[in-house]
């Protein structure tokens, strides 16, 4: 629906931080490959704008997509690559953002904080 009358063979999008590939079929028989690679450096966050929501990939890997044009049209693959997430987390902590540091290390919102509370309660 959001593509409207567009019939591009490939549409790249982002901002949601959610890795996803969708093939959209149009009434005229053509298709559009819609690719969102996810996020390179923000694998988890929560927000209340425009509504309360949480996005988590479950690990700290940097996300990206490989898009190729072959004999049978376009294809895409979602990729994940390790990087020095600990260095990024330390930068977040130095900036006073422990919440971001936890997300950078784990790919989850508040996970490390919950684990610390659970261990302390034992």
List where the protein language model places each region.
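Active-site environment of divalent metal-dependent phosphoester hydrolases
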Residues: 12-24, 42-46
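Short secondary-structure capping micro-motifs at structural edges
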Residues: 8, 16-19, 51-53
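Acidic, His/Gly-rich catalytic cores of divalent-metal-dependent hydrolytic chemistry
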Residues: 26-122
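Active-site-proximal segments of metal-dependent phosphoesterases and phosphodiesterases across multiple
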Residues: 1-6
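Active-site neighborhood of phospho(di)ester-bond hydrolases with catalytic His/Asp-centered motifs
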Residues: 10-15, 34-38
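Short active-site oxyanion
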Residues: 7-10, 75
């Amino acid at each position: 629906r959001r593509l409207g009358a567009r019939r591009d063979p490939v549409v790249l999008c982002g901002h949601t931080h959610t890795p996803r590939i969708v093939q959209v079929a149009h009434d005229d028989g053509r298709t559009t490959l819609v690719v969102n690679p996810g996020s390179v450096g923000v694998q988890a966050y929560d927000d209340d704008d425009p509504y309360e929501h949480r996005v988590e990939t479950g690990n700290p890997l940097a996300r990206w997509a490989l898009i190729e044009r072959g004999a049978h049209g376009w294809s895409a693959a979602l990729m994940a690559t390790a990087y020095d997430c600990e260095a990024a987390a330390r930068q977040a902590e130095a900036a006073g953002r422990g919440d971001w540091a936890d997300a950078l290390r784990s790919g989850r919102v508040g996970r490390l904080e919950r684990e610390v509370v659970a261990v302390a309660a034992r």
